[in-house]
Amino acid sequence: MFRGASAINMDAKGRIAIPARYRDALRVEHAGTVIMTVDIDAACLLIYPLHEWEQIEAKLKLLSDTDPLERSFKRKLLGHAQDCELDSHGRIVIPPALRSFASLEKKTMLVGLLNKFELWEESAWQQQMDDGNALIQSQDLASNERLAHFSL
């Protein structure tokens, strides 16, 4: 399970170091392999452990190749998907096309979302956090069926 947000600097070769607390699990449970792709509605990258990505692929297989929307959805996720291996220092290389998609330069945020990570350009992460906070404040959470009884 991945949780928390970590500020990570990307080096000149396009590598980021996965936080140490996740490295052993990724190596042991997922053979050090993660799959990186684009998000469908935000300028960030999604990073899935191999086992989690295989579940996504199974769902994508069920989508139509003849329905234009479903085909476009598959193309976006699968067309950008890249296998990435943790090196001996726990780093992964972010492919140039994916760096460009998410406008990644040096300062990034790696955000754990239980079964995957999101990778954001740092200022874009802050902006979406501000936007998300404003959205939460402006909404009646009780009107959302899944949030109505959510308690912390």
UniProtKB/Swiss-Prot annotation:
Molecular function terms from GO: DNA-binding transcription factor activity; transcription cis-regulatory region binding
Entry-linked Pfam families: MraZ
Record's keyword annotation contains Cytoplasm: yes
Chief subcellular location: cytoplasm
Limits of the SpoVT-AbrB domain: 5-52, 81-124
InterPro entries: MraZ (IPR003444), MraZ_C (IPR035644), MraZ_dom (IPR020603), MraZ_N (IPR035642), MraZ_sf (IPR038619), SpoVT-AbrB_dom (IPR007159), SpoVT-AbrB_sf (IPR037914)
Cystine connections: none
Keywords: Cytoplasm, DNA-binding, Repeat, Transcription, Transcription regulation
Subcellular location: Cytoplasm, Nucleoid
GO cellular component assignments: cytoplasm; nucleoid
Assembly notes: Forms oligomers.
Family of the protein in this entry: Belongs to the MraZ family.
Protein name from the UniProt record: Transcriptional regulator MraZ
Organism field: Shewanella frigidimarina (strain NCIMB 400)
Protein's gene: mraZ
